[in-house]
Regions:
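Mid-to-C-terminal functional-domain signal that highlights helix-capping/loop sites
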Residues: 1-179
Length: 179
């Protein structure tokens, strides 16, 4: 890590191989609940309410293929799907992380997924939201976590009728209906 600072011993970060990489979704054009006809009531979704109060649903059948979704708008955020734990984390992007573009890194730290930022070439703990290998400009930075709810599409829409949701048309050649 030439020219970078480390918050952990570099030898504790291990290459996990290309199977841990998945292409991120960058600023997908979110749909309204009414436009999301591809979802059925019992589909599993991860839901968040961002800092502006907007509800967003991340269907498991889509996020499992991408692992990282960067959402722009009033309250920029990054959603991270953890394949091992079958869970999702969400972080607000602000200050020095506002323009970060996160993606899967194919690295593990303490057995957990590490994400990378394409802008600063830094490595981050997906679990804690802290940089592991970083520029000095990121010294002391920690991403602010948002609560995430795992539920069904029907339950999420009932609680958040104005929710937005990831589109099935992502620009990637995937059959999201089969998962």
């Amino acid at each position: 890590a030439i020219g970078k600072s480390c918050s952990v011993a570099p030898h504790e970060i291990h290459w996990a191989g290309p199977k841990y990489y998945s292409a991120p979704l960058r600023n997908p054009q979110l749909l309204s609940a009414a436009q999301a006809s591809y979802l059925v009531p019992n589909d599993l979704v991860f839901g968040i309410v961002d800092k502006s109060g907007a509800a967003i649903a991340f269907p498991l059948r889509i996020i499992t293929w991408h692992h990282v979704v960067d959402v722009e708008g009033h309250s920029p955020l990054t959603a991270l799907y953890d394949e091992q734990n079958k869970s999702m984390l969400a972080y607000v992007r602000s200050g020095p992380t506002l323009h970060c573009k996160y993606s899967s890194s194919s690295f593990l730290y303490s057995g957990e997924h590490v994400i990378s930022d394409e802008q600063t070439h830094s490595l981050w703990s997906a679990r804690t939201g802290r940089p592991l290998v970083y520029d000095q400009s990121l010294q002391g930075v920690q991403l602010q976590a948002l609560p995430v709810v795992a539920t069904t599409w029907a339950a999420w829409v009932k609680e958040h009728p104005t929710t937005k949701v990831l589109p099935i048309e992502t620009g990637f050649d995937r059959d999201y209906r089969s998962r």
